[in-house]
UniProtKB/Swiss-Prot annotation:
Binding-site list for Mg(2+) 2: D356, D360
CDD domains xref list: Terpene_cyclase_plant_C1
Protein name per UniProt: Terpenoid synthase 9
Recorded family membership: Belongs to the terpene synthase family. Tpsa subfamily.
Designated gene of the protein: TPS09
Species annotation: Arabidopsis thaliana
InterPro entries in alphabetical order: Isoprenoid_synthase_dom_sf (IPR008949), Terpene_cyclase-like_1_C (IPR034741), Terpene_cyclase_plant_C1 (IPR044814), Terpene_synth_N (IPR001906), Terpene_synth_N_sf (IPR036965), Terpene_synthase-like (IPR050148), Terpene_synthase_metal-bd (IPR005630), Terpenoid_cyclase/PrenylTrfase (IPR008930)
Signal sequence, start to end: none
Cofactor: Mg(2+); Mn(2+)
Tissue expression remark: Predominantly expressed in roots but also in stems, leaves and flowers.
Motif (DDXXD motif): 356-360
Gene3D superfamilies (UniProt xref): Farnesyl Diphosphate Synthase, Terpene synthase, N-terminal domain
Co-factor remark: Binds 3 Mg(2+) or Mn(2+) ions per subunit.
Amino acid sequence: MEATSVFRPKLGSQFSLPSTTNLFPLRKLYGFPLTSFPGKPIKRIRLKATNTLTFDDKERTRKFKKLPLSEWTHYFHSIPLDISEMDALKEEIDELKPKVKNTFMSSQGSDSTKTKILMIYLFVSLGLAYHFEEEIYETLKEGFENIEKIMAGEEDLYTVSIIFWVFRRYGHYISSDVFQRFKGSNGSFKESLIGDAKGMLSLYEAAHLATTKDYILDEALIFTSSHLETLVATGTCPPHLLARIRNALSICQHWNFEVLVPLDFIPFYEQEKDHDEMLLKFAKLSFKYLKLIYLQDLKILTKWYKKLDFPSKFPPYFKDRCVENYFFVLPVFFEPQLSSARMLLTKGFILLGIQDDTFDRYASISEAESLGNSLKRWAPDHSMDKQPEYLKSVLKVILDTFQEFEKELSPEGRSYSVKYTIEEFQASSKANVELAKWAQVSHVPSFEKYMEVGQMEITACVTVAYILMSMGKTGTKEAFEWLKSRPKLVQSLCTKGRLMNDIAGFEDDMSRGYVVNAVNCYMKQYGVTEKEAFKELRKMVVNTHKTLNEEFLTTTCVSHYVLRETMDFARMIIVTYNGYEGFTRPDEGKIEEYMTSLFVDHTLKML
């Protein structure tokens, strides 16, 4: 096979080396185990390659894709905000909250716990769970102690599926054997279930909480997906339920942002005949208040961002994504009281974007090495004075912003969190330099070697560190040490982030001649087509879903809150790369639609 036929399209020079090359020795640099990924037997391919690596470090006309500035920043910087409206909403919420709580806690009868669990699902879906965290915790703790009694004799598919979903969502390991009751004598799910559209949808949602050993949930996903797709195609159920099924097939509730779910669920619930008017009103008030809090945050954040004046300091190679970055922190910190955490994490994301774009899209090798060395020293290296002004600005904004973090967190006695996060940022920068060297000479390493470096370059570890840094006292030293140990949950996050980014960003990478990508590395190593590579990489992504679920349920060395926010980061990855590159091209997928719904639209009419 000719080397030039392995990659499509042929853009610039294609360069690779056999996997035995010692020019890029495989080192355990980043704490990841050097295990092989599943794939086909290696098939040797002849590649056109030079004998030595050469770097052209002279100033030259750079080839980079100019990225347009975001229109969102100016919009929120100048938008008016009515504080009196926020105060009025808060007053109504405070008046209704105890009434809703009383309805939840006063459930009586033999099925009272079951009724409460079903209501917890409504709380989560309507965006209200944060109002009743203690009550939910106590209810599920008590319920889990009596799970066998609760499930005994329950034959309603919707009820069993929702109870399963709620317990697993909150970290309680309920066995998937509860679904055996819905199988016939032939070992397959009963055909009679097909007529229960809500039950089928709930089983479909429950199947996404599968672990690596929940084979019955694999069967359930196949069974429900095919029949739900038929329902959508034929339109044979109520329109409001049909819309919900269509949304679920696009992205299941478990892997969606918790704050995005109410956008669809509130209108759905309103059209349910048995909906609770008080609960519906409480959901609408809470969601409207939440949106106003976000506007308040964005006014403050965009003011900070505009003062930095990045467009005057950097060439237009970087992704101008202040408001978009704020959107991407919402799966982790969406509750109204967490404004400070959102601000901190958004600023961290902005730094990661500048770092990544500088290494990935613009810097020469000497510039990349100088920036990498400076970040390693956490001060300008000896060559920085000779570098272009833009690079000095990149380094300055990173160092200054971390100094800002230190100033904010030091009074809380949390300087250690900044130190740990800097270490992860430095490790990420080191990986960026390695990838930049490969990219500039179109070197395509083995898949395993690429993943070792690429998993760190994708910034999943430093993102978890940012999350811990932003969490307040819950982000303990022990939590950071857990991160440093590279537990299986974190490894799966890194794999998921790397693969989903590379799958969704493949077209963009190739269009600019950037061949260092998991797809190309897999094609080269295993001698497969692009289509086959995509198929295998997507299988790996699905496996990470199951591993994440499993680790969330079984990890005991850190707090549930840390695990929950880490899982929320996984949700960010999935929504961002759900069939499109949502960060680089937010206008081409659903990201812009989501942002408009959360930050601009006020379509949830009040009762």
